[in-house]
């Protein structure tokens, strides 16, 4: 281990590192022999600092961090957007850090900015990224995959954006965590995939060695990101990267420390155990040595996007995330520009709002006068007529009564793939920040509404905390199911799900 650490330190020059991998045995035994080299090259820079990097194909790129601007809200003083201006091979480009952004191609490289220093301040997760400078940049050659093909798969057996998600640098919100009085922000650093508790299979994203499973841990990994917990698995791959799978409803019996797993092999079931906040989801993150020499997060959004594309070949993906938080009466800009089509440009953006009005365009501005959790629908259409939907979450709080926060709501369904007319679909819902009222479902097919009642997150880990119902769609189509619940002040939380039913 000491030899491994000294090698890493020798590679750190002005905070720059090609994050080379090592075989499983090296972490425990001290071997420095590379096994699988990541395709990404990483640089941590202060404003005004530059570096020349060698990319994985042998080419070089010179980068300089010119500027960093971080925008904070006036509700929690949380960073809502960070923009770096970077000079790449003599040309300047601005990049938004994470929050559902993908690498961009510019000046013969692909580049992104996964983290900036503002996300580490007043954060309750300390320095999960291992960043000691102003910002981190990641580079790949133009046209390169982001992850070596055949070495990484999507870790949850459900469709893309099946329900709520919390990706990197987004303050956690699904379980009602966006409270004005709470200035200690949990900027999410991993990837949260919401799903139906106890139903969605979780698979190993890579081949790897199980280092910990539940409370059991292999010896020799004290200097590592591994932190055993009853609902957590850590797997080490041949890049020397650690993969964490958290909040599992069940861990498969064979998943024991020292066991090797294959990419795509089922290792557990999605749940809400551990520090889930009470909403059912898979927390997935990747950690590796960073240019600082510290263990830190390797941002995974681009990797899961690429993996899902390879496995499922979607023609179009609507993206209206991340969520928004605003005072009542303030304007909010809804943004679907991160939507994607295999055809190229999106031709139409059509918005349908909770108040029954509508608008068109990739960005729209809205003002909300009443507190609540809104869930605005965007439909995107490309030149081939392919369509997809996503939903923009807007949490609105009364500035005169900031302690009277509105309810929030999480819904999920299963299965999400290969649905046919007549198939039974399970729908689950749980509300947060209220125990008044009931949830009311409208399945979007003209059938009668269904009323259920969750526990309002009274007991976080209650196996019956989600209210459960089932529904069958009679005909093929693309349906938008809606569920809502109000609190004692009449403030409502609304969410939507997109369900695609195909011909038999």
Task: List each language-model region with its residue ranges.
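Conserved positions in beta-strands of structured domains
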Residues: 66, 209-211, 249, 271, ...
